[in-house]
Every structure is written in C-alpha cells, then in structure tokens.
C-alpha cells in the first residue's frame, strides 16, 4: 500500500511539473508577444512629397467673375498654322518716323508663325524696312487677349497692342514694346522689361499710365523667369476688365496693372509691328548690320487667343 501511495505521489508530481512547464511556456510566449507589441515602430521620416509643379500655360485667361464665363472670339484667334488669313488680318502700312518704311512683303505666315522681318535698304533715308499686321475685327471690355511671341534681337520695339486708329482721339493699350538688344547703352533692363502702358487721348489731350514689369520677378518655379525676350517664346496678355482697369499678364502670371484717368471705352483693333527710332526711350536706333542677320531680324508670333466675358 505504501508503494502504491508513493507511485501515486510521484505521478501527481510529474503532472504538476508538466503543467507548470506548459504554463511557463505559455507565459513566456505571451510575454514575448506583449514585448513585441510594445516595441515602437521604426521612426522613419516620411519621404517629403515634392510640391506639384505649376503649369503656368494653363493659368490664363484668368478666373472669370462669379456668374460669368469666357468665350473665344474666333475673329481674334489664330494658330498661324496655315496661310495668312485675310478674313482676320490686314497690313496697314502707315509709317513711323524716319528711318521706318512699312512694306507688305516684310510680314507673312510660315512655319507655324506670323512673322515680321526688319531688313535693310541702305540707299534710302527710310532704310529700316519692316511691316505691321492688324485685326479687321475690334473688341471692347470685358475681354482678354494673349499672344505667344519671340522677339527679333535688334534694337527695335517688338509690339503687341490695341488701338482704335485715330491718333488725336484714341484709346491705346500697349501690352508689350519689347527691345531685347538696345543699342543706346542706356536701357539695361530692356531685355526683360515689358513696357506696358495705356494712352487715352481726347482732342490731342493725352492721359497715360505705364507699368514696367520685369520678367525676372516672375515666380521662382516659372520656367521663363529671367529669360530674355529673344531667347524663348513668351506669352503676353491683357485683361481689359472695365472702363478703368487694365491688368497685364506674362507667362501665366499677373504682370502689373494700370488705371485709366478717364473712361476707356472705344472699340479697339489688335496690332503687331516692329519699328525703331533714334531715341533713348526706345533703346536706341537699330544697328544696320543686324538687319542683314537672318538669325535675329525677325519677330515671330506663334499664336493669338482672344476671349470675351459673358453671363453664364
């Protein structure tokens, strides 16, 4: 009987020991799980997401006022991918001062551009041969027009402007008067300066206000910041808001504004031309030898897009 009791005791001890070992294993496993759960995740610095690049070519025309929308004005819109569209454009050949001589053959459409070329006739007093292109249609506010332009790299004004055609009684908006290569050594900012302005003339009484926006002040991420007018195409435009307010644009960004002293209300034509004059405010007279250089003597217009505001 004593042996039976001893055997039973040993058996009970073995069972208790096994149970304790099993419980210990389970406890250790649970402790390990708890410890692993308690471990902080690796504190990795999340990769910085690069800011989305701004496509400045999509920012114009500007956002319309509430309840309004932009519609294209087809008569003042042209990609210049075909031939010179005589339904939309013509060549008024009135001259500026000597030495300018406007000629029809010095402008046209080719290779996807409207072009205006300055050439030399050294036998004449008016030796600066050039041209002008003007819209047949007119436009009034509220409107927006813009044109993508690469300038001739000569000392001359490459212009994109609006005018009603009467010098003594006129409204005029000069979107650009660009000169990327002034000869006078007196206009160091001209290769980047727009020279935007307005004129309001009544019976030869002139009111004027100008803005000299410089493309070196465009946003840092704008790919055309600091690029000279002759080095790349730039998109220049104007938002003629109302009878007083005129906002200029450059490469998708606001580029200065002017406020008219008098109501600015006349219907205006769109014009491009290329001309020179021996004055410092233009940048000095063109160098004759530059007019014989086919790589720099031509102003190129890739396209023009024009819009009117209407109620939705």
Map each language-model feature to its residues.
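Bacterial lipoprotein signal-peptidase II cleavage site
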Residues: 19-26
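Positively charged n-region of N-terminal signal peptides that target proteins for export
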Residues: 1-4
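Alpha-helical and His/Cys-centered functional microenvironments
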Residues: 7, 34, 204
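GH16 jelly-roll
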Residues: 40-312
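Enrichment for repetitive, rod-forming helical segments
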Residues: 9, 26-27
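C-terminal motif of bacterial Sec signal peptides marking the signal peptidase cleavage site
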Residues: 15-17
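N-terminal, intrinsically disordered, polar/charged segments of Gram-positive cell-envelope systems
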Residues: 30-41
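Sec-dependent N-terminal signal peptides
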Residues: 6-13
């Amino acid at each position: 009987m004593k042996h039976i009791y001893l055997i039973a005791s040993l058996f009970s001890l073995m069972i208790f020991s096994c149970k304790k070992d099993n419980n210990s294993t389970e406890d250790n496993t649970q402790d390990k799980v708890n410890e692993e759960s308690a471990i902080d995740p690796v504190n990795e610095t999340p990769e910085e997401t690069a800011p989305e690049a701004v496509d400045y070519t999509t920012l114009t025309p500007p956002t319309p006022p509430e309840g309004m929308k932009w519609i294209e004005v087809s008569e003042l819109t042209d990609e210049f991918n075909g031939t010179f569209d005589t339904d939309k454009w013509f060549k008024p050949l009135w001259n500026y001062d000597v030495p300018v001589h406007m000629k029809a053959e010095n402008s046209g459409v080719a290779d996807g551009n409207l072009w205006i070329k300055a050439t030399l006739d050294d036998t004449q007093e008016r030796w600066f041969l050039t041209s002008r292109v003007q819209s047949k249609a007119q436009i009034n506010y509220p409107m927006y027009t813009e044109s993508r332009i690469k300038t001739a790299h000569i000392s001359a004004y490459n212009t994109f402007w609006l005018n009603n055609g009467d010098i003594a009684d006129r409204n005029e908006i000069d979107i650009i008067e660009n000169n990327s290569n002034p000869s006078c050594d007196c206009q160091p900012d001209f290769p980047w300066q727009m020279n935007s302005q307005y004129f309001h003339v009544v019976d030869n009484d002139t009111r004027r206000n100008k803005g000299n926006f410089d493309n070196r002040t465009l946003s840092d991420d704008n790919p055309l910041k600091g690029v000279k007018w002759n080095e790349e195409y730039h998109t220049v435009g104007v938002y003629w808001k109302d009878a007083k307010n005129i906002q200029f644009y450059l490469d998708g960004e606001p580029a200065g504004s002017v406020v008219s002293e008098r109501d600015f209300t006349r219907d205006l034509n769109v014009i491009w031309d290329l001309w020179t004059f021996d004055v410092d405010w233009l940048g000095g007279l063109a160098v004759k030898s530059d007019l014989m250089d086919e790589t720099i003597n031509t102003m190129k217009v890739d396209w023009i897009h024009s819009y009117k505001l209407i109620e939705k």
